[in-house]
Structure formats: structure tokens, C-alpha cells
A protein has these predicted regions:
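C-terminal regulatory/interaction module of P-loop NTP-utilizing enzymes
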Residues: 1-136
Length: 136
């Protein structure tokens, strides 16, 4: 019922209940059912139903929680957030870029190094579409 109240009040077409349902399903598939996100994280939206408040919740609670769950495996975090299928890069909470490892280290190296670099994209948190595209 908390989420129904929030869904009625929050503007710009964002469904917090759908966000939670889809993200929790993805977490259950990628990790387990014991580590899903509770609706209590979103309770403050009842008093202040706004994208600004939702952004605060994601930046300060949801993203750090996902970083902890997935040991900063940003590829999995991107999957939970739907960033792999967003219509435009501006809606991605986490963006990646390919690293040219041989260029960085000048030649062949025998060390296992990630070939992508990840960055949290602050401006995505203020865009309603970033949240809508988690579940669409």
C-alpha cells in the first residue's frame, strides 16, 4: 500500500512499484531472493513525491546497496538498473567506456585487467525517463 500511495502521487509517469518489482526480479536472478530491495527505502516519497527525492534515494541508498550486493560488479548493476537497454546514454545511471589496455600500458601485458571503465552519471538521476526505462 505504501507503493500504491507513492505511485498515485509521484509525477512524470514514474511507477515506483514497477521499478521495485523489476529490479527485485533482476536481483533474484543475478544474485538471490534474500537480497531484494524493500519498499521502506522509498517511504520518504510519501511526504515528498518528487523526482528530486527519488534521485536522493537512488544516489544515497539504492546504488550503494547494489554496489555492496554485487561487489562493485558494475556490469551486473547496470543490468539491475536496465542501463544495458536504455534508449539513450543520458538515461543510464552507470555508463561504461571501453579501455584500450594495450595503449594504456604500451603493449602486451600478462595481468587480468578489466577492459571497461564505469562511472556513475549524476545527471541521469534528475531525469524521470531514467527511472521509467528501468521497467519499460
Amino acid at each position: 500500500q505504501v507503493l500504491e500511495k507513492i505511485d498515485q502521487d509521484i509525477m512524470q509517469g514514474i511507477s515506483v512499484s514497477k521499478i521495485l518489482e523489476v529490479m527485485n526480479h533482476r536481483i533474484a536472478v543475478l544474485y538471490d531472493r534474500e537480497h531484494t530491495i524493500g519498499h521502506a527505502y522509498f517511504a520518504s516519497l510519501i511526504e515528498e513525491p518528487s523526482v528530486k527525492k527519488l534521485a536522493e534515494i537512488f544516489k544515497n541508498s539504492i546504488i550503494p546497496l547494489l554496489q555492496e550486493y554485487f561487489y562493485e560488479d558494475y556490469e551486473k548493476i547496470q543490468l539491475v538498473l536496465g542501463d544495458n537497454a536504455k534508449s539513450d546514454n543520458q538515461y543510464k545511471f552507470i555508463v561504461d567506456r571501453k579501455l584500450n589496455v594495450s595503449e594504456i600500458f604500451k603493449g602486451h601485458i600478462d595481468v587480468d585487467i578489466a577492459e571497461k571503465d564505469y562511472k556513475i552519471q549524476s545527471q541521469a538521476f534528475s531525469l524521470a525517463q531514467s527511472y521509467i526505462e528501468i521497467y519499460r
